[in-house]
Amino acid sequence: MFASVLKKIVGTKNDRELKKYSLIQREINALESSIAALSDEQLKEKTPYFKEKLHTGASLDDILPEAFAVVREVARRTVNMRPFDVQLIGGMVLHEGKIAEMKTGEGKTLVATMPMYLNALEGKGAHLVTVNDYLASRDAEWMSPIYSFLGLSVGVIVHGMDDDERRAAYACDITYGTNNEFGFDYLRDNMKYSLEDYTQREFNYSIVDEVDSILIDEARTPLIISGPSEESTDKYYRINQIIPRLKKERDYTIDEKSRTVVLTEEGVARVESYLNVSNLYEPRNIDTLHHVNQALKAHTLFKRDVDYLVKDGQVIIVDEFTGRIMPGRRYSDGLHQALEAKEKVKIEQENQTLASITFQNFFRMYSKLAGMTGTADTEAAEFKKIYNLDVVVVPTNMPMIRVDHTDVIYKTEKEKFSAVIEEIKELHKAKRPVLVGTISIEKSELLSKYLTQTGIQHHVLNAKNHEKEAEIVSQAGQPGQVTISTNMAGRGTDIKLGERVAELGGLHILGTERHESRRIDNQLRGRSGRQGDMGSSRFYLSLEDDLLRIFGAEKISSIMDKIGIEENQPIEHKLISRAIENAQKRVEGQNFDIRKHLLEYDDVMNRQRQVIYEQRRNVLKGDELREDLLDMIEEVVEDFVPEYVDEKRHPDEWNLKGLEDRVLKQFSLRLDFSKSGDVGSLEDIQEKIVAAVNDLLNRKEAEFGKPLMDYLIRMISIQSIDSHWKDHLLAMDHLKEGIGLRGYGQKDPVREYQKEGYDLFMDMIRRIKEDTLEKLCMVQIRREEEVEEMREQSRQNYIMNRGEDIAAPATVRRKNEKVGRNDPCPCGSGKKYKKCCGANK
C-alpha cells in the first residue's frame, strides 16, 4: 500500500529515468534550427570536430546532444526520416548501455543510428547485432547513407563470406551482423595459426536488436564448432528398435513440467533383456544407458512438426520462440541422432566439440552492451541479474489505441477451434483483416484444414514455407485477408494496413494458445496497433492446451466450478486470465532458474576458455617466446624429477634408471645419472636436465636458423594447445553429465564442478607443456628421400605389429598440482603466476 502511494508521489524508476532523458532531449531540440542551417559540407565536418573533442578530453556524454542533433538532421536529408523526440530518448537509453523497450513500428532501426554514430567516434568499432542475415543486410543498406554522409564506414557480416571480406567488415567503424556470425567468428579466430588471419578486433560497443530473443531465448543454446568423432552409428538404430516396445507408466514415466523421461525398474530390466546387457548401470554400460535415455526423449518428448520437421531427408530443428527452422543446428549428446533414427533418415555421425561459447558469455565480453526490443520488461529481473542491463520502457510516439480483449476459455480444444472459426467468419464477412497465431506447424496446418472446409481463403505462414514470408506479411493488413502464422510473424515485421481497414477497426490478432512466455504473446499482439493504428486482439484457449494442462489446469478448473461453467460455454473472467498469467510466470521463473544454473556451469568453462585463448594469442604474438620456453622446461623438469628423486631417502634408493628413461622419452636426451658417482642434490639434477634440454634446443636453432625455430615453437605449441583443449572440452562435458548426482551426497554440484574442473584444467596445462617439449626436442629436418624411406618403414612396421597393444606404465602424480610460472595465478587475478604471487619466488 505504502509503495503504491510513494510511486504516485515520486513516480516509478522508469518515470524518473524518462524525466532525466527529457532534459537532454530538450537540449537536442534547442540545437535543431542551428544545425539545420548548416550546409552539407559543414555537417560533414562535424565528425572530425567531434573526434578532436574526444581526443582533447571530452567524453561521449559531453558531445551527445550535438552529435544526436547532427544525426537527426543528416537522417532528414539522406533517408527522409526525422527521429521523433521519443526516438531521441531511445537512442540515449542505448548509449548508456541499457535496454530500450520500444513497441512495434516505433522505428528502432533509425533509433540505433544515433548511439552507433556516437560510440563509433572513438575509433574502436560499434556492432549492431540482428537475428538474421536479411535484417542485417537490410538495416545496413537503409542506414548506411547516414553514416556515409558523416564519413563513417559501414560493414555487414553475413553467412558465406570469406575471411578477407569479414576482416574488412570488422575494420569498419560500424558493423552489422547476426549473433551467430559474431559468435562463430570469435571461435574461428581462436583456432587460427596466425594473428594476421584473425578477423575481429576488440569488443567495444554493441547494440543487440531483439535482445530478449538473443540473450534469453537463445541463452540455453551454445555456439559449437565441432569435428567428426569416430563412433559408429549402428547403436542408434539398435536402440531405436526397442523403444516402441516399451510402455508408458509400466516402463517409463514422463514429467511434462520439467520435460524429462525416466525408466522405471521394470523398464530397466526390460531394456537389459532386449539389449542382452547384464547391468545397465555398470560403468562400461553408462554410454548405452545415455543413448537409451536420449532415444526415449526423442520418442516421447519431441514431436514432429512441433519441435522439428523432416525435410529433404534431414531432421531440422524448429525454434520454439520464433517458429523458424534452424538449418545447420543440431541437438547435442546424441539426441539429434536419436531423432534421425526415429524418423528413419540417414544418421549423421555424432561430433566432438572443438570450440564452444554461449551467447551469455560472448556478449558479456563487450565493454558496453545495449539492446532494443518490443518486449523486455517482463524479463527485466533476468537482464539485470545476468547481464547487469537495466530496462527502460520508452513511450510510444502516438498513443496506443489497440483494444486487448480478455481471454476466452473453453473446456476442450474442439470447442475452442469451433469458436475461432466462427470469429474468423464474422471478421472475414466484415472485410476486416485477421492474423491468427498458433504455437506450432502442426496446429497451423490443423486450423488451415478447418478453414478450407468452411471455404475461407487464407494464407499459412510457418517454417515449411518460410520463403514466402515477405509476400504473405505484406498482404496481411489488406481488407478481408486471413493469415495463419506460427511465431514467425511475431518479430521484425511491420504489417501495414490497407485502405479503409482502420475504419473497420484495424488488424485483429487472434491467438489460439498461450505461449509459455508472456513476451511471445505480447509480440503477437504487437503486430496490431502500430504507430497509433486501430487494432484489437483476443486469445482463445482451452483446458487441453499444453500450458494450462501442465501448469494451471487444477487451479482454473476449480475457478470454473466456483463460477458454475457448463459444457460448451465459453468463459471470460479476470480470475481466469490472472490464473493463466500466474501459470506463465511460474514457467518463466522455472526457465530463468534453468538458464541461471547453466550459466553457473558455463562460467567455469568461460574462465578456462579465456586463459587458453590468451595463451594462444601470446604464443602467436611471440613477444616472450624463448623466455616462456625456458620457463616451460624448468616447470616440466621440476614437476617430474621428484617422482624419481625423493630427498627424504638415501641417494642409493633414488630411481635414477627410471629418471633416465623419462628424460629420454620426454626430451629425446640420453643422460647418465646412475654411473656418474655423486649425482648431487635434487636441485643439481634438475639444473643438469634443464641445461641439457636448453643446449639441445640451441643446437637445433643453430641448425635450423632462428626464424624457422621460432616458427616451429609457435606451431608445435599451438597444435598442442588445440589438441589438448579439444580433449579437455570432452572431459568437462562428461564431468558435467554426472555432476548432478553429487547433490544426493549433500554436496553442491556447482562447487564440485568448479573444483574438479580446475583439477582437469591444470592437468591439461601440464600435458600441453610436456607434449610441446617432447615434439620440439624430437623435430628434425629431413631430405625428401629420407622421408619416403621412413614412410615405407612405418608401413612395414604397421603390418608386422598390427593388433599388438603395449600398455604404457601409469605415472604416479603428486596429489596437489604444482603451479607453473606461466600458469594462471591461483589467486584469480588472471595474470601469470610468475608476474603475480610468484614474482618473488
From Swiss-Prot:
Requisite cofactors: Zn(2+)
Entry membrane topology: Peripheral membrane protein
Keyword annotations of the record: ATP-binding, Cell inner membrane, Cell membrane, Cytoplasm, Membrane, Metal-binding, Nucleotide-binding, Protein transport, Translocase, Translocation, Transport, Zinc
Any one GO CC term of the record: cell envelope Sec protein transport complex
EC number, as in UniProt: 7.4.2.8
Catalytic reaction(s) noted: ATP + H2O + cellular proteinSide 1 = ADP + phosphate + cellular proteinSide 2
Binding site for Zn(2+): C825, C827, C836, C837
Source domain of life: Bacteria
UniProt subcellular location: Cell inner membrane; Cytoplasm
One Gene Ontology term of the molecular function aspect: ATP binding
Gene Ontology terms describing biological process: intracellular protein transmembrane transport; protein import; protein targeting; protein transport by the Sec complex
A Pfam family it matches: P-loop_SecA
Enzyme's top EC category: translocase
UniProt-annotated binding residues for ATP: Q87, G105, E106, G107, K108, T109, D494
Keyword Cell membrane: yes
Function: Part of the Sec protein translocase complex. Interacts with the SecYEG preprotein conducting channel. Has a central role in coupling the hydrolysis of ATP to the transfer of proteins into and across the cell membrane, serving as an ATP-driven molecular motor driving the stepwise translocation of polypeptide chains across the membrane.
Family: Belongs to the SecA family.
Quaternary structure note: Monomer and homodimer. Part of the essential Sec protein translocation apparatus which comprises SecA, SecYEG and auxiliary proteins SecDF-YajC and YidC.
Protein name: Protein translocase subunit SecA
Organism: Syntrophus aciditrophicus (strain SB)
